[in-house]
């Protein structure tokens, strides 16, 4: 697939993401937009400077970029978390000259944020809990953070297979092998990002509580 078509697909994906965000019931205040921007920047930095790139030549990397997708979803909501991760990490791919990767990155990170947000605020109702609730609270925080990152263990290699097969033109056997390796890499990333997101969330909640 030509680079021009990749850029066109990326534009369509980003436009759809923005449309979904606009059609959602999410209220975007100035403070929330600023927070999304900061978290997107932190996602970019975490990916660019805290990663082991191109594991086994697959194009996948060990990194902590997903931390801030989950963290934003826990702090705000799923759409905000999805936008923060999608913007920050897709931008990292664009800066690296990989619009093909940016297409799937935007979709995957948006999904992570949405799932984390649903579990945090709809399933566990994290906004109604506090450290005083003990184990229930910590299970809710960990479960919410890990939910979206666990989904990514399956969606990343799945979308990655079709990206490598039809955008990059890899042979089916090679694309399948890369997808299997990617699944393992993504699992490790998910575990690391869950730990980081949970620790950061608990720390931020602690320091924001009135003394």
Language-model segments: which ranges?
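Loop-helix junctions at membrane interfaces
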Residues: 1-208
């Amino acid at each position: 697939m030509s680079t021009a078509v990749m850029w066109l697909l990326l534009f369509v994906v980003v436009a759809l993401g923005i449309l979904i965000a606009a059609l959602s019931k999410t209220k975007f205040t100035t403070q929330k937009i600023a927070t999304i921007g900061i978290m997107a920047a932190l996602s970019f930095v975490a990916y660019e400077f805290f990663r082991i790139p191109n594991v086994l030549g697959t194009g996948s990397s060990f990194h902590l970029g997903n931390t801030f997708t989950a963290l934003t979803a826990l702090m705000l909501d799923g759409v905000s978390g999805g936008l923060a991760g999608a913007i920050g990490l897709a931008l990292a791919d664009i800066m690296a000259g990989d619009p093909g990767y940016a297409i799937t990155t935007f979709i995957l990170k948006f999904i992570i944020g949405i799932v984390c947000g649903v579990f945090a605020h709809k399933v566990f109702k994290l906004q109604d809990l506090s450290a005083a609730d003990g184990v229930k609270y910590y299970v809710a925080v960990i479960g919410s953070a890990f939910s979206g990152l666990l989904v990514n263990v399956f969606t990343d290699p799945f979308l990655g297979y079709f990206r490598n097969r039809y955008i990059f033109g890899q042979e089916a056997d090679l694309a399948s092998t890369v997808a299997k390796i990617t699944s393992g890499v993504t699992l490790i990333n998910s575990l690391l990002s869950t730990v980081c997101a949970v620790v950061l969330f608990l720390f931020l909640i602690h320091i924001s509580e009135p003394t």
